Curated annotation (Swiss-Prot):
GO molecular function, one term: arsenite secondary active transmembrane transporter activity
First-listed, main subcellular location of the protein, grouped into a coarse class: membrane
Compartments reported by the entry: Cell inner membrane
Gene Ontology CC: one annotated term: plasma membrane
Pfam families assigned to the protein according to its UniProt record, in alphabetical order: ArsB (PF02040)
Protein name: Arsenical pump membrane protein
Source organism of the structure: Yersinia enterocolitica
TM segment ranges: 21-41, 46-66, 98-118, 136-156, 178-198, 228-248, 249-269, 274-294, 316-336, 337-357, 371-391, 407-427
Xref: NCBIfam families: 2a45, PRK15445.1
Length: 429
């Protein structure tokens, strides 16, 4: 256990701090090779882990490429300018609409896309409105927070969701039927906490006339229009074709190819830049990191956690839901959500839980791994990248401020979300 744990910690350190520019793919690969050479994992574990990650990472990359193409076309800026006008000059209403826009983008384009794409747009828009740095920080923190807390409803809304759904063979419709109502509760709780926490930083009014016209944001009309069609067809495809056995990644890939072809033909978007900006490293990172995590499983960590989950399962639905959710949220905050979701899945699979109790644990693991990363900056790689993007915009957020905000905001939202899950599953008892 000590050797497997040491290799895992080394993987996290290299991935988070990236010494001398070492990419996350290389760091995970080096540590996976170390785990293999040291006997922590075996050659036979490689195809097992690949079977866990291939569909998830392929889907994630396809969704991110679609979001990057739409961003280049002006899609998200157009949407942000529209919702800003819906605020009608009232600061609190503007804050609400920005948060709801973030929730919608997170649901359709994954949490990473929501945080990284919306943040620069929101900053530019708030600067145009003449908002103070403190007010801008409130809006930016809100956009970053909702990106994760609202990434529950669909399998494609978060890489964590895809990994878990693949592991337990959850269908797209089956997953959405449980998590859509849970996500609504999460959004409502998040919106309430954000308004409460930042109540002194939200201006009473703003001048709508300072905003650009939404139409002026559209840089590639053809890709912009095609984007709407692709999004509708993707959602239909996910719900209709996935139950027929077609992988979510294949459906997403078709949508990506269609939108990419439209953008390529129009010449207004630098499609080469978009491809270079796609997170290709996540494929290598996921395989390498999960091989290292599999080493923890081989060393007995998941067996120990399975015992903890068995105790929770014996106490009923509420204990299983809240216990699993808070446990994986804590683990995500200290050891990153990507490895935690697999550790959680392996532990649940190894437990004696069954029926609705096991179902509650599966979804609570997803909730914990989606929301838990908001407690600390190291909870997800996307958060670290988001903080880096902010620093480039002269908005430095200290780890202390992030942790203080994160723990105050996350725990109540996590509680409400897990309660909503328990209520949703109790309906099917």
């Amino acid at each position: 256990m000590l050797l497997a744990g040491s290799i895992f910690v080394l993987t996290l350190i290299l991935a988070i701090w990236q010494p001398r520019g070492l990419s996350i793919g290389w760091s995970a690969s080096i540590c996976a090779a170390l785990a293999l050479v040291s006997g922590v994992i075996h050659v036979g574990d490689i195809p097992v882990v690949w079977n866990i990650v291939w569909n998830a990472t392929a889907t994630f990359i396809a969704v991110i490429i679609i979001s990057l193409l739409l961003d280049e076309s002006g899609f998200f800026e157009w949407a942000a300018l529209h919702v800003s006008r819906w605020g009608n000059g009232r600061g609190r209403l503007l804050f609400t609409w920005i948060v709801l826009l973030g929730a919608a983008v997170a649901a359709l384009f994954a949490n990473d896309g929501a945080a990284l794409i919306l943040t620069p747009i929101v900053i530019a828009m708030l600067l145009a409105l003449g908002f103070s740095k403190r007010t801008t920080l409130a809006f930016v923190m809100a956009a970053g927070f909702i990106a994760d807390t609202a990434s529950l409803p669909l399998i494609v809304s978060n890489l964590v969701n895809i990994v878990s759904a693949d592991f337990f063979r959850l269908g797209f419709t089956e997953y959405a039927s449980v998590m859509l109502p849970v996500d609504i509760a999460a959004i409502a709780a998040t919106l309430g906490m954000l308004h409460l926490f930042f109540r002194r930083d939200i201006p009473a009014t703003y001048d709508v006339s300072l905003l650009k016209m939404p139409a002026s944001a559209i840089k590639d009309p053809a890709t912009f229009r095609a984007g709407w069609i692709v999004l509708v067809l993707l959602l239909v495809g996910f719900f209709v074709l996935e139950p027929l056995g077609i992988p979510v990644s294949a459906i997403a890939a078709v949508g990506t190819v269609v939108l990419f072809a439209v953008a390529k033909k129009g010449h207004a978007i630098n499609t080469g830049k978009v491809l270079r900006g796609a997170p290709w490293q996540i494929v290598v990172f996921s395989l390498g990191m999960y091989l290292v995590v599999y080493g923890l499983r081989n060393a007995g960590l998941t067996e120990y956690l399975s015992g903890v989950l068995n105790m929770l399962a014996d106490k009923g639905l509420l204990a299983a839901t809240f216990g699993t959710g808070f446990l994986t949220a804590f683990l995500s905050s200290v050891m990153n959500n990507m490895p935690t979701v697999l550790v959680g899945a392996l532990s649940i699979d190894g437990s004696t839980a069954s029926g609705v109790i096991k179902e509650a644990m599966i979804y609570a693991n997803v909730i914990g791994c989606d929301l838990g990363p908001k407690i600390t900056p190291i909870g997800s790689l996307a958060t670290l990248l988001w903080l880096h993007v902010l620093s480039q915009k002269n908005m430095t957020i200290s780890w202390g401020y992030y942790f203080r905000t994160g723990i105050i905001m996350t725990l109540p939202v996590l509680f409400v979300t897990l309660a909503a899950l328990a209520l949703r599953l109790s309906v099917t008892l």
